[in-house]
Amino acid sequence: MSSLKEVKNRISSVKSTRQITSAMKMVASAKLHKAQGRIENMLPYQRKLNEILTNFLRTDASFESPYTEKRPVKRVAVVAFSSNSSLCGAFNSNVAKMLERALEDYQSLGKENILIYPVGRKVEEAVKKMGYVPQGSYQVMADKPSYVEAYELAEKLMHEFVEKQIDHVELIYHHFKSMGSQVLLRENYLPIDLTQVAQEAAEDVPEDARSFNNDYIVEPSVGELIAELLPKVLSQKIFTVLLDSNTSEHAARMLAMQTATDNANELIQDLTKQYNKSRQQAITNELLDIIGGSLK
């Protein structure tokens, strides 16, 4: 059995750790609420943009764009979103595992034809360990989501796709559903599937807005307006994914720190019982020694 001093020191150490995890949970909670607020502020714009696009796609279902062109995949780009720091459970390791599976799917293309855009330090480190060269560093964007930086990344991807430098683009990120649920997704980004966009956009439109009269007079043409809207939708998608990933990170860290704090509380209880038991045994032994000595 451990000495009283050892158990007491361990209790003190665990209590100090509990203070750290509890403080980190509070910080993560504050950041989570801020991130949720950013998503809520962005949603009205996204919904309206999707609503307008859906209505125009119904008008011109045969619309074609450089962003919709499907061709044989000879060169692919994968954009993976993670965090810059750890202590958020399996958040980063799950992204790395899904990225590894995606790279295995495109292994036949050769490493030189697989471009990886890592958003976040953890996934950037994972990419280097896998033997790939990251296509830039986006660590600042992972910590502080910025529409300007998201727009620049989207512009780069769209330009490379239109110029046929890449034939397919995928996104790997966590979608924030609730405090306890962050779903890891692997989605196609380019070429864009207009049918799927219209379907998702229709689901995002509130029920009371679906019956609204959307018989717009369009100048110069529906096709030209859709052509203007698509880059905005694609840029908005990258920003939405960035906010999603950032919010999911804070939720995962908050949950991890809550679990760590709960585990620390349980360990303190067990160690306190052990300390009391050891102390009781020590007192009993002293009493027995005293009683035994008095009987001699």
Give each language-model segment a name:
Residues 1-296:
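C-terminal beta-strand-loop-alpha-helix "lid" module of Rossmann-like NAD(P)-dependent dehydrogenases
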